[in-house]
Structures are given as C-alpha cells and as structure tokens.
Amino acid sequence: MFLKAVVLTLALVAVAGARAEVSADQVATVMWDYFSQLSNNAKEAVEHLQKSELTQQLNALFQDKLGEVNTYAGDLQKKLVPFATELHERLAKDSEKLKEEIGKELEELRARLLPHANEVSQKIGDNLRELQQRLEPYADQLRTQVSTQAEQLRRQLTPYAQRMERVLRENADSLQASLRPHADELKAKIDQNVEELKGRLTPYADEFKVKIDQTVEELRRSLAPYAQDTQEKLNHQLEGLTFQMKKNAEELKARISASAEELRQRLAPLAEDVRGNLRGNTEGLQKSLAELGGHLDQQVEEFRRRVEPYGENFNKALVQQMEQLRQKLGPHAGDVEGHLSFLEKDLRDKVNSFFSTFKEKESQDKTLSLPELEQQQEQQQEQQQEQVQMLAPLES
C-alpha cells in the first residue's frame, strides 16, 4: 500500500514534533510528500488509492495532541483536514499550469542568456566553488562537534554506570534505597545531555542558511548584466533555488533533532532496565549494571557514525541544486522539471497562511470571551448580594 512509502516522513515528523503543537511545516511536509508519491506512481496505482489516505496521515499528526484540556488541537484538526484535502485536489491542476508557465519563463530566460552562455556557465561555476568554500568549514565543524558532543555525552553517562556497580558491591543489603537515586539521576542526565547536544548541533543549519542567502545574492549580481530585460524572471528562478537550498537546511536541522531524540529513546530504556531490576534478584541487577556501560557506549557511537556525515551530504545536495540551475539556464537544458520547487513553495505559503489566520482567530475568540466571563462573575456577585439581603431579616 502507498501509505508505507510515507512511514519515514511521518516518523520523522512525529519525533521532531513530539513535544510541541502540530506546525504548518509538519502539515505541509506530509501533504507535499503525499503529492510527490502520487506523481511518481503509475497511473493504474494512483487510481486505486483511497482519497481518505491523506486524511489518515494528517490525523496521525494529531493523535498525541487530542484529549488534552486545551481544545486548540481538536479545533485545528477539524478545520485543517477539509482545507488540506481541497488544497491537495488543486495541486494537480496547478502543477500542469505552473509547469507550462515556468517552461515559458525558462525559454525566454535562456534565449536572453544564449549569447552569453559561456560567461553565464562560468559565473555559476565560480559561484558554486565559492559556495563549497563557504560551506566546507561548517561541515567540518559540524562533524567535529558531533564527535565532541558524543564523546562528552559518553563521559557524562559512563561514571553513573561505574558508580552504581560500586554501590551494588558496597550496599548489598539495601540495594533499592542505595541505587534508586543513582538510576533516577542517570535518567535525568540522559535528558539533560541530549537537550544540550541538540542545542549545540542544530544552530549549524541556521548558519548554512545565512551562507545560502549570501551566495544566491552574489550570483544574482553576477548574472544581472546578462539578463537586463529578463531580470524578474532570473530573480524568480533564484527564489526557487533559495527555497530548495533552505529546505535542505531545515531538513538538516530536523534530522539532527530527530537523531538526538532517537538517541534519547534508545538510552532511556537502559536506565529503566536498571530501575526495574532493583525489584528483582541481585544476580539480574549485577548483569544489568555490568552491561550498562557497554550499551551506553554502543548507542552513543552509533549516533556519532550516523550524524557525522550530515554536513557533507548537505553540501553535496546544494552543489547538485546549483548544477541543476546551470543546466536549466544553459542552451542544452532539455526537459527539466523546474516547476516543482515553486509548486511546493506555494503549497507551504498557503499552509502557513492558514495557520496564521487560524491562530489569529483563536486569539480574537479568547479576547472576546473575556468580557463574557467578567459578566458572568458580576451576575454571580449580584446573586450572592441578593441572597445576603434576603437572609438579613431572618437573622434580626
């Protein structure tokens, strides 16, 4: 079934937003991945897809948010699903129309740049090399920081395992009272260190976005002399490039955060296992503590190996996108699917607008409800005063 194809997307979204409200970016990501998968499927397969599948995916975002005292998530879900379904149905029509418009735009832009094809290609190549030079230090720093933070995390947690083994040897008669505080402290230390790790790694994505803005602006200036009467079309193409590159930066941040949360979820059961064995026999506890240090090292090392290449992979993706721009603007572009990034940008803009409007209305509704609450309080006070006045003659 097609839903299996988006399990990874939903899992990443769920981990990244497990402690926060459902966001516009999460909703747009689910919608875009769903649309992309439909576009990539054979027509026969698409015809068999149930229209309810998008609704199921969106509802999955809310499954952990419903049932709370705050009704925000429930109200948002009721209004969002119909909006998203209608917006998705329009995407296919908008896609064909936009593809035609972007195709014409690129034709005019290529025709204008054709007399300067070699110079344009050279400028983009120069800009590409400058981009690589700017990003390489940050990718190296990210790799180093991942290794440093992983080692620091290991150094922070390993002593707890060693300390609990020592306490086990010295306090065999009162294990629960002696070890429980250490097991609780280990769990708290895991949470604290994972949050610190995320705080040190995720800002690199923002640094990358700053460099993207600088690079694209320099490219705009270098190509401007060759596109004097088609500057607006060139700007539009560069906006699409910027969107793609910054999307990669946001995905990098989300992947780092999701990997850190996955590390937390892998480490937490180790502390819980120790706490659970406190109620069992000494032999089981000894085995659990003996294996704890090795398990901690293993999970931290797996995190390091998985996350270290993120920076280099991000750089490669940006280089590829810059090369695609050079191909689109070149004389031998062929049939390039250049409209999809603009379609996705439009989708995300519409979803962001929906969320902004919804939150503004929610805020207005809360503001309007305050006078009603005050009026109810005044009525209650008047009723209490009337009751006191009615009782006064009886007391006399």
From Swiss-Prot:
Stretch forming the signal peptide: 1-20
Disease implication from the record: Tubulointerstitial kidney disease, autosomal dominant 6: A form of autosomal dominant tubulointerstitial kidney disease, a genetically heterogeneous disorder characterized by slowly progressive loss of kidney function, bland urinary sediment, hyperuricemia, absent or mildly increased albuminuria, lack of severe hypertension during the early stages, and normal or small kidneys on ultrasound.
Effect of R305C: In allele Budapest-1
Tissue: Synthesized primarily in the intestine and secreted in plasma.
Region Disordered: start-end pairs: 361-396
Regions of compositional bias (Low complexity) in chain numbering: 374-389
Sequence similarity: Belongs to the apolipoprotein A1/A4/E family.
Effect of V13M: In allele APOA-IV*1D
Keywords: Amyloidosis, Chylomicron, Disease variant, HDL, Lipid transport, Phosphoprotein, Repeat, Secreted, Signal, Transport
Domain free text: Nine of the thirteen 22-amino acid tandem repeats (each 22-mer is actually a tandem array of two, A and B, related 11-mers) occurring in this sequence are predicted to be highly alpha-helical, and many of these helices are amphipathic. They may therefore serve as lipid-binding domains with lecithin:cholesterol acyltransferase (LCAT) activating abilities.
GO biological process: acylglycerol homeostasis; cholesterol efflux; cholesterol homeostasis; cholesterol metabolic process; chylomicron assembly; chylomicron remodeling; high-density lipoprotein particle remodeling; hydrogen peroxide catabolic process
Gene: APOA4
The protein's name: Apolipoprotein A-IV
Source organism superkingdom: Eukaryota
Subunit structure: Homodimer.
GO cellular component: blood microparticle; chylomicron; collagen-containing extracellular matrix; cytosol; early endosome; endoplasmic reticulum lumen; extracellular exosome; extracellular region
InterPro entries documented for this protein: ApoA_E, Apolipoprotein_A1/A4/E
Organism from which the protein derives: Homo sapiens (Human)
Outcome when changing E185K: In allele APOA-IV*3
GO MF entry, a single one: cholesterol transfer activity
Region described as 13 X 22 AA approximate tandem repeats: 33-330
Function noted in UniProt: May have a role in chylomicrons and VLDL secretion and catabolism. Required for efficient activation of lipoprotein lipase by ApoC-II; potent activator of LCAT. Apoa-IV is a major component of HDL and chylomicrons.
Predominant subcellular localization, coarse grouping: secreted
